[in-house]
């Protein structure tokens, strides 16, 4: 449904639960758009950008993060500045940018005010541009902005439809249902192989010593175990 509605030209806001394959869906969509569509796919950080660049095969899609986009545009306009000032300088100078038919935002929940200002400028130069935003407010990682993201997205998208990705490929049905109660949203777990164990700090250290770093994701308190 997501790809069908997007190819129909609709502005879309996707509320995607954890492990629902939202980024994979965006990548499939980019490969499904006609080759004459000029697509700007903005990710929140560099790691997401590199992953998307490796998986999107269509040459009509520009994949970058916000700082990378600002850097490219400023360089093209012969404007130089330090990396920390990229977005600020972009918003102040408002350099000319390329034309795009489609704007795709990944992890929209982490958009900050300066990124919102950048997006408004991009939209002002591409008023007919289709906008697709995918994210999950319950997975908001960064909290260094006063921006009301839901209100911003509603205004920025204008007339749009809202879709929900509720199927979680990471969690079992029981764990997904429990997380859904905590977050007050529907999460349908389909990974019956998911196992959660409670371990002592010593057991955790011993377990991690036997694993490959690329296979491990650690979530914990800022102060450690």
Describe the role of every protein-language-model region.
Residues 5-57, 61, 67-72, 102-225:
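Conserved helicase motor core of SF1/SF2 NTP-dependent helicases
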Residues 6, 82-101, 122-126:
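Short basic/glycine-enriched coil/helix segment immediately N-terminal to the Walker B
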Residues 60, 80-83:
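Cytochrome P450 catalytic domain signature, combining two hallmark sequence patches
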Residues 73-79:
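P-loop/Walker-type NTP enzyme "switch/lid" segment
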């Amino acid at each position: 449904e997501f790809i069908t509605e997007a190819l129909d030209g609709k502005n879309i806001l996707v509320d995607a639960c954890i492990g629902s394959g939202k980024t994979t869906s965006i990548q499939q969509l980019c490969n499904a758009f006609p080759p004459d569509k000029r697509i700007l796919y903005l990710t929140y950080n560099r790691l997401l950008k590199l992953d998307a660049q490796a998986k999107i095969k269509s040459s009509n899609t520009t994949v970058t993060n916000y700082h990378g986009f600002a850097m490219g545009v400023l360089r093209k306009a012969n404007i130089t500045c330090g990396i920390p000032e990229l977005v600020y300088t972009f918003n102040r100078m408002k350099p000319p940018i390329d034309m795009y038919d489609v704007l795709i935002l990944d992890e929209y929940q982490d958009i900050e005010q300066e990124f919102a200002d950048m997006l408004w400028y991009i939209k002002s130069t591409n008023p007919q541009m289709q906008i697709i935003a995918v994210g999950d407010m319950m997975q908001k990682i960064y909290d260094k902005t006063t921006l009301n993201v839901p209100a911003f997205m509603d205004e920025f998208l204008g007339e749009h439809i809202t879709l929900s990705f509720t199927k979680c490929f990471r969690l079992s049905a029981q764990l997904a249902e429990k997380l859904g109660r905590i977050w007050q949203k529907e999460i349908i777990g389909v990974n019956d192989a998911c196992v959660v164990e409670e371990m002592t700090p010593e057991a955790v250290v011993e377990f991690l010593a036997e694993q490959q770093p690329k296979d491990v994701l650690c979530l914990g308190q800022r102060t450690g175990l």
